[in-house]
Each structure stands twice: as structure tokens, then as C-alpha cells.
Amino acid sequence: MKKLLILNGSLSEATLIEEAKKLGYYTITSGNNPSLLGHALADEYIPADYSDKEAILKIVKENNIDCIVSCANDFGVITSCYVAEKMGWPGHDTYENALIMHQKDLFKDFIQKLGLRTPVSKVFESYDEAAKYVKTVEYPIIVKANDLTGGKGILRADNEEEALFAIKNAINRSRTSRFVIEPFIVGNQQSIVTFVKDKKVIASVTCDCFSPINPYLIQSELLFTDTDKAVENELHESIEKICNTLDLKDGIFTLQYIVSDGKPYIIEMMRRCLGNQFLTVAHAVTGFPWEEALVKAEIGEDLSNLKWEKPLAKYAGHHGIMVRRNGKIKGYTIPEELQKHIFKKIDILKPYEEIDDYMNQRVAYIYYKYDDKQEALDTIKRMNDIIKVEFAD
């Protein structure tokens, strides 16, 4: 039996682990948190920091592993591309391309040169240089650590004082101490998730993003959006242009963007599975086998026999149950008006476990489906009020 290494075992990778086993692979997970739920689904767990590309390469060689699948983190993508390149494996972009796409400064520079619409960024490595720059800018701006995901190391600034604080935050959070400063674009934040085969988009889904508790961390999403067809076509053309320019491999390609004055401004991109089992929701509204396609693409298997299914719902989404303070959680209740729409639920915290970072931690995830989009939107906007979380302290 061939051995496959997946670079983490969190909730986000659980469906990939299950898919790899369905495909007949002896599935090994890594990562440095042994308590993650996905490790129990795998055949074996080998602890390692998946951002340490040399450590992962050593594991691959010592354990006669045959192929590698990235995780829901940019560092994991960079590592998987590096290891695949060293081992001569198919299914992954070059290490150089992985860096271009998952380091904010390199990516923004690349797409600006390519002529794609994006907020114009300026890259910094020193506090003093950036401090001088923010005396001259038009506010608001946004400051982003160069190499982090999930909203970490990102702050909006509406004046010089806030900008200096945001710069210090980005420097302290980034592993490289590099960060970007760019104009804050006012508009609707959305994502487009596609699967690319032979540099052409063959499956696509758009979603609205909601971040009511932490403005830099998506808490809820709803698929599909009412995206203007011209906007969607422009995004598809941008994705295919990037794929052709960099000679990218088959796989997931996601763009996060802001629609302002009817035009999309690209702000982030990802070549990996998304967090919170997003692909489960994407399958619900498209019928496309996202997890199967991703795993097969990254291990170099044939994609010609992928089968589309009838979509589960017209609209679907996910919501991470969060709270507005730290403390010990006793439990939570979901009202019937929402419960009847839920098709999947995953508890993250057990009763009496502690929340110590309420701006980022989730109590549970719920996955819901609707036939009426306005009903879904109205409910999503009230979820933090109608889902009752009880504290034990």
C-alpha cells in the first residue's frame, strides 16, 4: 500500500484524510498538535512542524512516503511544494511559485506587474521606514504581516497613531518581520474558489464573507453570491492568466477580493484546501467532488473520471460559533429556526473547556442550507445573537 503524507490533522484536513483513505492510501498526518481530531482518522501520526520543510523532507525519506498533500495553511503549501520538488513528485507547483503565491509582498508585486486590479501595496522591513511612510498616506490603510493567514497580523488604521500600532503588531507577528501597507478598499469582501485543470477553470463557486466579531477573521460564509457575471468572468480570466504565466499545476485556486464600485480588487490568493471544511459547503451547492479532485491532483492521479453529483442545496454556508469574551464554556443552544437548516455540525470545544483567545477560537462549526437567499442572509446576520453560548464561570 502506498503511503501518503497530509501536512496536518485539524478539522480542516479531516475530509482530505478520509478521501485519501478511500483512494486506498496508507495515510499519515503530521503537525505539532497531537490532539487535533484529524489525527485519529489517519493510519499514523508523525509529529513535526509542517512549516519546517527540511524536517518534513526528512520524514518523507525515512518513512518511504510516496506522495504529499498540503494542508489548510500557506506554510503547508510552501512545504509540500518544496518536498515534492526535491522528491521529483508531480501534482505540486514549483517551490519558487509557491513563495510567489503565498508571500503577500511577492504576490502583490507579481499581480501588479501582470496588470490585475489590486490595491497598490508597499513593502517594508523596518519600523522606522514605515513610520515615515504613514505620515504621508491617505487614510484608511491596512497593514498586513507578510506571511500569515487567518487574519493574523492584520490591522486597519484610520490615523497615524493606529498605523504605528499596526506596524508593531505586524512586525511582532510575522516570522520574517516583513509587512505590507496598502489602501483600505471599502466594499463587499467575497471569495471565489475554483478548481483549475490544464490551466482552465472547470468548477467555480463564489461566497459572501462575514466577520462580525473579528474583522480580519471570516466567521460565516454563504454560497453563492449574487456576483455580477462580468465580475465573475474577470476573476476567471485573472485566475487563468496567473496559471498560464506561472505554468501552475491542476488544483484549487482561490481569490479573496473586494467589490468596490462594481469592480473586483484582488487582496489575497490561496492554492490549498480552505479552512473550516469549506469544500464540504462548496460540494453542497455545486455537486463537484472538491476533496477528491484536490487529493488526486496533489498526488498526480488522473482527473478525467471526476463525477459531478446533484447539488444538495441552492445556497449553503458555514458559521463558526464564537463568543465575545474569554472563559470556560458550559454549552450552547441553537434555535429551531436555524436548527432545521443545519446539515452538519462539528463541536470543537467540550463542555467546561476554556476559551482563552475569543477573537480567534470557535466553540463549534455549523453547516447550513437554504432555498431562499434573503432568509439565509437575515439569519446569518443574527447568528451571534440567536445562538446562545453558556459560560460556566
Residue ranges and their predicted role:
Residues E234-L255, S260-D261, M270-N326:
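Active-site "cap" helix and flanking loop/linker of ATP-utilizing ligase/carboxylase catalytic domains
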Residues E85-G153:
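A conserved helix-loop-beta module that forms one wall/lid of the active-site cleft
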Residues M1-E96, D128, V323, P351-Q361, ...:
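ATP-binding N-terminal substructure of ATP-dependent carboxylate-amine bond-forming enzymes
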Residues V295-D393:
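Peripheral (often C-terminal) accessory segments that flank ATP-dependent C-N-forming ligase machineries
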